[in-house]
């Protein structure tokens, strides 16, 4: 017997995410409820200058209550391809555009409770976006 969803109910619909509770029947017949964050997916970009320097952003993150350095990233809009998101986000967040793009990874950020699939790109040939 496989795990099966017996019922699902929405807990919260926010701007980007949706939180649902799923009532599951486990392979051993036991019932449990999982809370899942549904996320449309995101991209992360490693922008590399010709000299090898990587562009980092310093941003305040309310979830952890502090500023941190991070690579540019953003949420995939409905109907948007991951690479198109990356090209949009690098301009919005850094003011650069890139001549070459290489996808280096794709992974679920927190598969125990979230559906977010992260697409990671290296961007080279950086020039000002104007």
What are these regions (language model features)?
Residues 2, 34-88, 105, 126-130:
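Conserved Nudix-box catalytic region and its N-terminal flanking loop in Nudix hydrolases
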């Amino acid at each position: 017997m496989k795990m099966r969803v017996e019922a699902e109910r929405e807990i919260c619909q926010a701007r980007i995410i949706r939180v649902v509770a799923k009532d599951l029947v486990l392979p051993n017949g036991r019932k449990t409820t999982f809370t899942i964050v549904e996320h449309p997916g995101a991209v992360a970009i490693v922008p590399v200058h010709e000299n090898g320097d990587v562009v980092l952003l310093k941003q305040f993150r309310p979830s952890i209550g502090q500023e941190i350095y991070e690579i540019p990233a953003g949420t995939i809009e409905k109907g948007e391809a991951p690479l198109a998101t990356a090209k949009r986000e690098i301009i919005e967040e850094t003011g650069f555009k890139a001549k070459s793009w290489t996808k280096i990874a794709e992974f679920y950020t927190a598969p125990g409770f979230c559906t977010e699939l992260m697409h990671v790109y290296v961007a080279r040939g950086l020039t000002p976006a104007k």
